UniProtKB/Swiss-Prot annotation:
A Gene Ontology biological process term: sodium ion transport
Statement: the UniProt record of this protein carries the keyword tRNA processing: no
Disulphide-bonded residues: none
Main location: membrane
Protein name stated in the entry: Cation/acetate symporter ActP
Pfam families, sorted: SSF
Gene that produces this protein: actP
Length: 551
């Protein structure tokens, strides 16, 4: 019974722990892989050409932020999948399956938990009410300046933390796969992400994400097919043979006790489940399609692609047990896997496709990072230029040219900051950074979006107090928790005993928003409640919503 209890809880512990598997600990530098370098250069050359092509078609603010709303639902679904599937999760989940078997499947399923929330509760209404950023939705019937300031701050904190995790992950992965120096790798990723976003905007970012998704799905599909071919496409054979060669034997086919602390597990689970629906770079993608119908299609396709991908990682993990585990070519003198368990999928690529396919998978891992950081950079730049500069500082009176200039300056600044933080945080725990980013998205962005769309009694006062309460509670509890208070600051015991704060910070955000809204008897508050009806009609019908260009 206890095992079932822990396995149910571990269902919620999603990408962060899997990423920890992939990218924490000592990195074993690999020899220079010429095929990987060539394929990576081909990818970079191709995507830079796409950026040049996109720059010729990016003339207005709408083009820059949303690709003119001309992306189809299918294309956007692929791009969202490309934005969401990280290299760390690919290597991490494969490594987890390789080491623990069935437990890896729990993590794979966990990645999908947040997507039904976006599909059923958010996608259509977000597209009907917003134009460029989710702050357009949150501030639809509330006071523009305070709500946009809150939304932009929430976005920038999430983007900064997620960028740190991606840049550190980029450096470690490239050092691992290509044999390049960590600092060189971080600078290279920073320069490329700035080029994509600065010149190509959302159009270039979208196509980089689509190409990356196709490459990753194709590579993973080929690996899974080759694994299944080796067992005559029989799952019983795959699992029974894996049990025979794995050191843990039959226990890899049953759930284990991966989670030791139920409160931390539940807290991280809530963060990753609801945080997905508060990630600015994911939400921004819904404005790239023409209408709410295409937005709904986007999530439908994205969920399918992401779910399919994580099924493949499970097969890849078991394939690694079968084809990599017993093969001494992939082991060091001590009998451990070269590069650690996180290299299981990469070694499997070598086992099923030789050095050429190994080079392809290595290049795909790099492409994956570039796609994610490009999306994050654009989301951060739009929060500064559209929400802070145009709406707060200029009070909605900024012209397009000035707003775009501010956005592009922000892209350059974000690139420099990302490189600096990537180098500064080289030895920090990536899982912790990702968990914090999701915790803040779930504690600040998600409550404001969902309540503003569904609750007619929300007022600016309630949204502001609840949002800032959620944001500050998440940050304060994280600082007082074991990772920062003990590991980084060197105190003996943490004041807040759990790893992640979302269980408490989300409650603080929702309760604060509810209480300070229902006790708001001001004239402004009454007017904001009356405006809900017209907002509801537009959110359901799309009447008056901005339309994208023709496909």
């Amino acid at each position: 019974m206890k095992i079932r209890h822990w396995s149910a809880l571990s269902l919620f512990v999603l990408p962060a722990l899997a990423q920890a598997e992939a990218l924490t600990g000592e990195v074993h530098r690999q020899p220079l892989n010429i095929q990987a370098i060539v394929m990576f250069l081909l990818f970079v050359g191709g995507t830079l050409y796409i950026t040049y092509w996109a720059s010729k078609r990016t003339r207005s603010r709408q083009d820059y932020y949303t690709a003119g709303g001309r992306i189809t639902g299918f294309q956007n679904g692929l791009a969202i999948a490309g934005d969401y599937m990280s290299a760390a999760s690919f290597l991490g989940i494969s490594a987890l399956v390789y080491a623990s078997g069935y437990d890896g499947l729990i993590y794979s399923i966990g990645f999908l938990i947040g997507w039904p929330i976006i599909l059923f509760l958010i996608a259509e209404r977000l597209r009907n009410l917003g134009r460029y950023t989710f702050a357009d939705v949150a501030s639809y019937r509330l006071q523009q300046r305070p709500i946009r300031t809150l939304s932009a701050c929430g976005s920038l904190v999430v983007v900064a933390l997620y960028l740190i995790a991606q840049m550190v992950g980029a450096g470690k992965l490239i050092q691992l796969l290509f044999g390049l120096n960590y600092h060189v790798a971080v600078v290279l990723v920073g320069i490329l992400m700035v080029l994509y976003v600065l010149f190509g905007g959302m159009l270039a970012t979208t196509w980089v994400q689509i190409i990356k998704a196709v490459m990753l799905l194709s590579g993973a599909t080929f690996m899974a097919i080759m694994v299944m071919k080796s067992v005559n496409f029989n799952f019983n054979t795959l699992f029974s043979e894996a049990v025979k060669v794995h050191p843990k034997g039959l226990s890899i086919m049953s759930p284990g006790g991966l989670v030791s602390d139920p409160i931390s597990a539940l807290s991280l689970g809530l963060a990753l489940m609801f945080g997905t629906a508060g990630l600015p770079h994911i939400l921004m993608r819904f404005f790239t399609v023409s209408d709410a119908k295409e937005a709904r299609k986007s999530v439908f396709y994205a969920t399918g692609f992401i779910g399919y991908f994580y099924i493949l990682t499970f097969i890849i993990g078991f394939g690694a047990i079968l084809l990599v585990g017993p093969n001494q070519t992939f082991k060091d003198a001590a009998g451990a896997l070269l590069g650690g368990n996180n290299m299981a999928a990469v070694h499997l690529a070598n086992a099923v496709g030789g050095s050429f396919f190994l080079g392809f998978i290595s290049a795909v891992a790099f492409a994956t990072i570039l796609a994610v950081v490009a999306g994050l950079t654009l989301a951060g730049a739009s929060a500064v230029s559209h929400d802070l500069y145009a709406s707060v500082i200029k009070k909605g009176k900024a012209n397009e040219r000035d707003e775009l200039r501010v956005s592009k300056i922000t892209v350059i600044i974000l690139g420099i900051v990302a490189i600096g933080l990537g180098i500064l945080f080289e030895n920090q725990n990536i899982a912790f950074m990702v968990g914090l980013a999701f915790s803040i998205a779930a504690s600040c962005n998600f409550p404001i979006i969902i309540i503003s769309m569904y609750w007619d009694k929300l007022t600016t006062r309630g949204a502001m107090i609840g949002g800032w309460l959620g944001l500050s509670t998440a940050v304060i509890l994280m600082i007082l928790g074991p990772t920062i208070w003990v590991t980084i600051l060197g105190h003996e015991k943490p004041i807040y005993p759990y790893e992640y704060p979302a269980l408490f910070s989300m409650i603080a955000a929702f309760v604060g928003t509810w209480f300070f809204s229902i006790t708001d008897n001001s004239e402004t508050g009454k007017q904001e409640r009356l405006l809900f009806k017209s907002q509801f009609v537009r959110s359901q019908t799309g009447l008056g919503a901005s339309k994208g260009g023709a496909h």
